[in-house]
Amino acid sequence: MSKIKITGTFLDEISHDIPHQNWGKKEWSQDFTYMKQMGIHRVVLIRCGYKNWLTYPSEVLVKQEKAFTPYLDLVSLFLELCEKNQMEFYFGLYDSGRYWTSGNYTEEIRLNKKVIEEVWELYGHSSAFKGWYLSQECNRNAGAIIDLVLGTGRLLQKGFGGKTGVDLTLHRRGEEHFTIHPANRKNNFYKFRPTF
């Protein structure tokens, strides 16, 4: 019987019910070392922010959502640790915790468009930055949530910073998340599909 390898994991720094923001550079560095030792080569930031909590100093979200500026730029740290440990990094978009959950998908898309542009400007240069993760969950009770997924995918399909495009192909997987995955980093061409 062959062993099933675990090659990827989520970084759930901003959480609904788990204490967060209690790790610094030392703790995250040790965690990445352990992940590399066990064969992890892909990490997905489950969300860059949730309501007022952020993983990076977003001017957009501080201004528009009254979010708190974090004491440490975790996105920068995660990218640095990914580069050091030869890991791929996937960026989870912002979860307002209010627009999309109340059916206002247009506002969630509008806000994430600004986040995407800001993040690409700040971190798109990193060799570890490999793609995007759409953190809003799809399930049978979410109504037209597919509009959010399609809208955000189309937004990325048009490109941001004039540097990339997305081949939008949806794969429904029950109540699981979707991600935008690069098919060809060299040509900045992305494919929209599940992460793992």
Predicted regions located by residue number:
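Aromatic-lined substrate-binding rim segments of carbohydrate-active enzymes
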Residues: K25-Q37, H41-S96, I145-G165
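Short, acidic/polar
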Residues: H20-K36, R110-L122, E176-F192
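Short, well-ordered coil/turn segments that N-cap beta-strands
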Residues: S2-T7, G39-R42, E83-F89, H125-K130, ...
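Flexible loop/turn segments at secondary-structure boundaries
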Residues: N52, N141, R173-G174
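The substrate-binding groove and active-site-proximal loops of carbohydrate-active enzymes
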Residues: D12-K25, P57-Y71, G97-R110, Y133-A144, ...
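Mature N-terminal, pre-catalytic/accessory segment of carbohydrate-active enzymes
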Residues: M1-L45, S126
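Active-site-adjacent "subsite" loops/lids of carbohydrate-active enzymes
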Residues: P19, L72, S76-E83, E88-G92, ...
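Aromatic-lined carbohydrate-recognition surfaces of secreted/lumenal glycan-active proteins
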Residues: F10, E88-R110, G131-E137, V149-P182, ...
